[in-house]
Design a protein with these regions (language model features):
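Helix-loop-helix hairpins in multi-pass membrane proteins, especially solute transporters
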Residues: 26, 57-198, 214, 223
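Hydrophobic alpha-helical segments of secondary membrane carriers
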Residues: 133-137, 268, 392-396
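Hydrophobic transmembrane architecture of multi-pass small-molecule transporters
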Residues: 27, 41, 171, 398-489, ...
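Small-residue-rich segments within alpha-helical transmembrane domains of MFS-like 12-TM solute carriers
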Residues: 22, 88, 104-112, 141-143, ...
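Transmembrane core module of solute transporters
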Residues: 2-61, 65-70, 84, 95-96, ...
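Cytoplasmic loop-to-transmembrane helix junctions
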Residues: 41, 126-133, 385-392, 475
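Small-residue-rich alpha-helical segments with characteristic i,i+4
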Residues: 141-146, 355-440
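C-terminal membrane-cytosol helix-exit motif in multi-pass small-molecule transporters
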Residues: 166-185, 202-214, 232-246, 491-498
Length: 511
């Protein structure tokens, strides 16, 4: 009980922080309308949070050594809660963007800290349970975000997307301060910190996240700002990596990549991030833009993914106690790839009923993808490197999500145009099916509008809309196939990892 209670409290904090990544995803239009924001400003409600979060996550190992797990987590929970309150009180879009950045900045440390704490609180086979809990939270929280966000916005208003964090955030801060006693702070590390390295990393990751999040909207390298961000990110991150390899006390230890399991684990975490976040991005987008469903209807339609994720947890625990984690992870990755293949048969008529089984196949194996990667990727590292490595490991999952969403967004634009041009080429007088459809639409709409000319024009618009919807649907199918390919590659790489046997006891200096 001494281990379970503090770990459970920290998991609540991690869940809330991960939930807030996607809780606004289905309600951005409501937030933008409430704050009188322009269309090109609304996405910054999401982007500002992600930029701030991805900067802090790799620093969490160093921050834990400076302030201790107890006080870093407590401070993160307090800061996250206060920033959530400010988000709810935001008076315009600029204040909302600032407060969302603070929310991501202050709450980011709660995520990787839980990963390292699990290795302190649990040894031997008990780590299977801890990894299962972490894997479930890491996969289900972003999935439930749009569902919960859509319900709250429809039932109350968008302000409550942030106010719901106040009670759990306060309780987490109080109980972590009381219960968590893992290590002691060492503020002397502040004197020896590599501040130039921190600056390079912040600039590099911040501009990289902006490049990935905003590139599609601004047509990538045709925009000067996007091009500048790409160059700044590349140069800054290269300089940061080189500096981290030569300074005495780096804030991020890249030497952990010399461990085969950790390097492969990071790649698999990256791929899992692509799958989880990209599908969360694609499915609501399809239901909203192609099917025209509301935020709440979209949430209901994708709820089966979250339910299936929870159902997979006890199955994973039972299997993980008996079988090699590598084969379990291969099963999870292969099932996720199979789900993406089933999604590729999507049509413009698909709704909750048609999405049910593909989403169950996608949701059930999520814990099989995430939980083994924690044990296999981090479990083979020396205790002294574990804290630093956890930040990198978590950053790779978030970075995978950012890359996946960016690539899928670019694919949707490019492939929609490609498919529309291909379909439009068949819309001519020689196509009997098309002319029959147009004739029927014209007759029906003419009767409603009272004019053959108006009816014909309305029929042409409807034909264009139907064609564009089909082109969009084919583009979504292409995006799901691309994700499937990433999971096929990841599945093939798992056997290269070494088997990890859970330790029976934690070293005294592990944290």
């Amino acid at each position: 009980m001494k281990a379970i209670l503090p770990f459970a409290v920290m998991c609540v904090g991690m869940f809330v922080a991960l939930l807030d990544i996607q809780i606004v995803a289905s309600s951005l239009q409501d937030i933008g309308g409430g704050l009188s924001a322009a269309q090109d400003q609304i996405s910054w409600v999401q982007t500002s949070y992600l930029i701030a979060e991805i900067i802090v996550i790799p620093l969490s190992g160093w921050l834990t050594r400076v302030f201790s797990t107890r006080w870093l987590f407590t401070g993160s929970a307090v800061g996250f809660t206060l920033a959530s309150m400010l988000c709810g009180l935001a008076w315009n879009i600029d204040s909302m963007i600032l407060f969302r950045a603070l929310q991501g900045l202050l709450g980011a440390s709660m995520i990787p800290t839980v990963f390292t704490s699990s290795f302190h609180y649990f040894q031997g086979n008990k780590r299977v349970y801890a990894a299962a809990v972490i894997g479930t939270i890491a996969s289900i929280a972003p999935t439930l975000g749009p569902v919960i966000g859509g319900y709250i916005t429809d039932a109350f208003n968008w302000h409550w997307l942030f106010y719901i964090n106040l009670l759990p955030g306060t309780l987490v801060a109080i109980f972590v301060a009381i219960l968590v006693k893992i290590d002691e702070p060492d503020v002397s590390l502040l004197k020896e910190a590599d501040y130039p390295g921190i600056f390079l990393m912040a600039i590099g990751l911040g501009t990289l996240e902006y490049f990935l999040e905003e590139g599609t909207r601004w047509n990538w390298f045709s925009d000067n700002t996007i091009t500048a961000c790409a160059w700044i990110s590349g140069v800054s991150l290269l300089a940061f990596i080189i500096r981290s390899m030569i300074v005495k006390n780096p804030v991020v230890d890249f030497r952990a990549f010399g461990n085969r399991n950790f390097a492969l684990g990071c790649f698999l975490s990256f791929t899992t991030g692509i799958g989880i976040f990209s599908t969360i991005y694609l499915t609501p987008l399809f239901l909203g833009y192609v099917r025209g469903l509301s935020a709440w209807q979209t949430g209901v339609a994708i709820f089966s993914t979250g339910a299936a994720s929870i159902a997979g947890v006890p199955v994973y625990i039972a299997l993980a106690r008996k079988y090699d984690l590598r084969w379990i992870m291969m099963f999870g990755l292969a099932c996720f790839g199979l789900a993406m293949w089933s999604f590729s048969f999507i049509t413009s008529d698909w709704g909750g009923d048609q999405l049910l089984w593909p989403q169950i196949i996608r949701g059930f194996p999520q814990v099989f993808c995430v939980a083994p990667s924690v044990t296999l990727g981090l479990g083979s590292l020396a205790p002294a490197r574990l804290k630093y490595a956890s930040g990198l490991f978590n950053m790779m999952r978030n970075l995978g999500g950012a890359v996946g969403i960016a690539v899928c967004g670019a694919m949707l634009n490019a492939r929609t145009n490609f498919h529309f041009a291909a379909l439009a080429g068949h819309l001519n007088a020689g196509n009997g099916a098309m002319t029959g459809l147009l004739r029927g639409l014209t007759g029906r709409l003419s009767r409603g509008l009272g004019s053959p000319v108006a009816g014909h024009q309305a029929a042409l618009r409807e034909l264009w809309r139907m064609t564009y919807a089909q082109a969009q649907t084919l583009a979504y199918s292409d995006a799901f196939r691309a994700i499937m390919l990433a999971f096929v590659i990841a599945t093939c790489l798992v056997p290269l990892m070494r088997k990890v046997t859970p330790a029976r006891a934690a070293p005294a200096d592990a944290h």
